[in-house]
Amino acid sequence: MKGYIVQIEDATLKNENYRQVLFTAKHCQLVIMNVQAGDQIGEEIHDLDQFIRVEAGEGVIMMDGQKHAVSDGFAAVIPAGTRHNVINTSSDGLKLYSLYSPPEHKVGTVHKTKKDADTDEHHHFDGTTSVA
């Protein structure tokens, strides 16, 4: 099979890793995340589009200086070139999934913690996909 099927809500809610790449195609990538209580992704700007859907927890998504409160069921589309950050304001993990278009991370990337992600200089997409 060339595609990927997953019960995304279950996968996202069960995820205990800060970041885990589930599937990478040529033009998009599916990633699940668990941002710990009081933590944040960190302000960033991508040269790609990003979709985020929150499955659990409460937080704030900052886009170009505007603050947006989010919780279970909220989604955000972040166009390429938009300064953004995701901040967990709840006492539990902020669990979300993200679609990057095109891919952002290498196939198989798993970061147990944000510190692991911040110190991994080799996690950016290298052109390899999950599709053989």
PLM regions and their residue ranges:
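A generic "binding-loop/recognition-motif" signal
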Residues: 26-28, 37, 47, 66, ...
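Ligand-binding loop in jelly-roll beta-barrel domains
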Residues: 80-106
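A short, N-terminal "cap"/entry segment at the start of jelly-roll beta-barrel domains
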Residues: 1-27, 111-132
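Short acidic-glycine-tyrosine-enriched beta hairpin
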Residues: 66-80
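Conserved short histidine dyad/triad with adjacent acidic residue
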Residues: 15-16, 31-46
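Glycine- and acidic-residue-biased ligand/ion/polar-headgroup-sensing regions
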Residues: 49-59, 64
